[in-house]
Amino acid sequence: MQQKAFEESRYPWQESFENVAVCLPLRCPRCGDHTRFRSLSSLRAHLEFSHSYEERTLLTKCSLFPSLKDTDLVTSSELLKPGKLQSSGNVVKQKPSYVNLYSISHEHSKDRKPFEVVAERPVSYVQTYTAMDLHADSLDGTRSGPGLPTSDTKASFEAHVREKFNRMVEAVDRTIEKRIDKLTKELAQKTAELLEVRAAFVQLTQKKQEVQRRERALNRQVDVAVEMIAVLRQRLTESEEELLRKEEEVVTFNHFLEAAAEKEVQGKARLQDFIENLLQRVELAEKQLEYYQSQQASGFVRDLSGHVLTDISSNRKPKCLSRGHPHSVCNHPDLKAHFHPKGRNHLKKAKDDRASMQPAKAIHEQAESSRDLCRPPKKGELLGFGRKGNIRPKMAKKKPTAIVNII
């Protein structure tokens, strides 16, 4: 049962070497004499992948050759053919058979979990290690024979290979460390540049926000300024309209002032004429009063009354003529005798006594009226100036006539 299971568990490449197994120096301690190997490395590969031995260092060494193809390898059957055993010098240039065995066993062991992850090694290292292993296999094939011990040579060769392998691993580690340091420095540099770029980006973002804030503030100021300009334009338009109205009012007021000035000049001229006429009448009345008083003192009343009547008629005659009365008293011949009756003399004496007390008062009133007429008109008196000027001369004209009548 166990033998059948063992036969089923064998790999296909093991059956191809059963015929030449007797010529190989090394045999598998688990499989027996029917499984033999030409070199120690092939035996280790067989033990590693076919049995339960777990030698990590050997696995690491064997895993350096996964890229080699089976078509490039030379099988042990081809090496053991007649005519091939004598040409041991050419075997060094060919690939060993244990590498082929390792590749085949590795293909059959893909379903199982690998022991460890193997790092990639340089091609020069693979070539050097392969050449050294081939050289060792060739030496082993030439020297090995049935009954010849080669353990010392194998041990020294393996020590040499381990030492060289360790040196190469150290060199590779140093190279990897250098590259890691270089990449670390580049990463630090890129990180610093990235931080600088990020800081610049943050700064530019802040500046952009500040510019946007200023833009919004300026937009608000511009809006306020536009509104103020619109209000000022409206006020300016209203001011211009008001100014035009004021100018029109000023022009109208100037025309009014010109008309008022013309009327004032005319009024002053009329007033001056009236004052001159009034002064003449006052002077004439004073002369008549003086003459009347002088005649009363001398006692010649009759002659004085006749003289006064003749003077009055002579003074009133041009006035009546100027007024255009055709039927005046002075021109009527039948009424002249009415002023000289004897019954009128006593009445005239009483009137003369009363009139002697009133000349000063009349003169004072006339002076006040002339002062009022000469007074400059005020603002409120501009419109009524012509009317007042027309009323006062009429009143002044009535006073001399009354005085004359009293006399």
Swiss-Prot record:
Induction or repression: Induced by gamma irradiation and zeocin.
Keywords attached to this entry: Coiled coil, Cytoplasm, Cytoskeleton, Metal-binding, Neurogenesis, Phosphoprotein, Zinc, Zinc-finger
Any one GO molecular-function label of the UniProt entry: zinc ion binding
Tissues of expression: Isoform 1 is expressed in brain. Isoform 2 is expressed in placenta and at low level in lung and liver. Isoform 3 is expressed in kidney and pancreas. Isoform 1 is expressed exclusively in brain.
Biased segments, Basic and acidic residues type: 362-381
Coiled coil feature spans: 169-297
Top-level taxon: Eukaryota
Renumbered zinc finger spans (C2H2-type): 26-51
Any GO BP annotation: dendrite arborization
Subcellular location as annotated: Cytoplasm, Cytoskeleton, Microtubule organizing center, Centrosome
Phosphothreonine modifications at: T175
Listed GO CC annotations: centrosome; cytoplasm
Any Pfam family hit: zf-C2H2_FBX41
Region (Disordered), start-end ranges: 347-392
Quaternary structure annotation from Swiss-Prot or TrEMBL: Homodimer. Interacts with NDE1 and NDEL1. Does not interact with TUBG1. Interacts with DISC1. Interacts with PARP1. Interacts with MCRS1.
PANTHER family named among the record's database cross-references: PROTEIN ZNF365, ZINC FINGER PROTEIN
Described purpose of this protein according to its UniProt entry: Involved in the regulation of neurogenesis. Negatively regulates neurite outgrowth. Involved in the morphogenesis of basket cells in the somatosensory cortex during embryogenesis. Involved in the positive regulation of oligodendrocyte differentiation during postnatal growth. Involved in dendritic arborization, morphogenesis of spine density dendrite, and establishment of postsynaptic dendrite density in cortical pyramidal neurons. Involved in homologous recombination (HR) repair pathway. Required for proper resolution of DNA double-strand breaks (DSBs) by HR.
Name this protein carries in UniProt: Protein ZNF365
Phylogenetic classification of the source organism: Eukaryota, Metazoa, Chordata, Craniata, Vertebrata
